[in-house]
Amino acid sequence: MSRVTAIISALIICIIVSLSWAVNHYRDNAIAYKVQRDKNARELKLANAAITDMQMRQRDVAALDAKYTKELADAKAENDALRDDVAAGRRRLHIKAVCQSVREATTASGVDNAASPRLADTAERDYFTLRERLITMQKQLEGTQKYINEQCR
C-alpha cells in the first residue's frame, strides 16, 4: 500500500499545485482588472468634470452673448428711433457749429444775417450710420472683454 499511498499523495500534491497555480493566475488577472478599472474610473471622473466645466462655460458664454446681443439690439433700436424722430421733425440734431454770416447789400452796414446751421441730408445719414457702428463696436468690445476676463483666466 505504500506505493498506492505514494501515488495518491503525488496526485494530491499535483492537484494542489495546479489549483494553486490557477488561483494565482486568476488572482493576478483580478488585480490587473482592478487597476484598469480604477484607472478608467479616474479618467471618466476627469472627463465628466471637464464636460461639466465646459457646459458651465458654455452657459456662461451664452448668457454673456445674450446680454450683449440684447444691449446691442436696444442701442440699435434707440438709434433707429432717434433717426426716425429727426427725419420726422419730432427731434432735432444739434451740432455745435458756427455759421458764416451773409451780408446783404440792402441791409444796414454791420447787421449780419446768419443762416441757421444744418447738416446736409447725406451728412445726417452718415452721422447715424457712424453712431450705429460705434455702438456696435462698443458692445462687441465690451462683450469680448467680459468673455476674456471671465472665461480665459
Swiss-Prot record:
Catalytic class of the enzyme: hydrolase
Q: Which Pfam families match?
A: Phage_lysis (PF03245)
Q: Which GO terms describe its molecular function?
A: peptidase activity
A further note on this protein reads: Encoded by the cryptic lambdoid prophage DLP12.
Which stretch is the leader sequence?
A: none
* This protein's UniProt keywords: Antimicrobial, Bacteriolytic enzyme, Hydrolase, Protease
Q: What is its EC number?
A: 3.4.-.-
Q: What is this protein called?
A: Prophage Rz endopeptidase RzpD
The record's function comment reads: Necessary for host cell lysis. It is believed to code for an endopeptidase that cleaves the amino-carboxyl cross-link between the diaminopimelic acid and D-alanine residues in the murein component of the bacterial cell wall.
Entry-linked HAMAP family: I_SPANIN_LAMBDA
Encoded by which gene?
rzpD
Gene Ontology biological process = defense response to bacterium; proteolysis; viral release from host cell by cytolysis
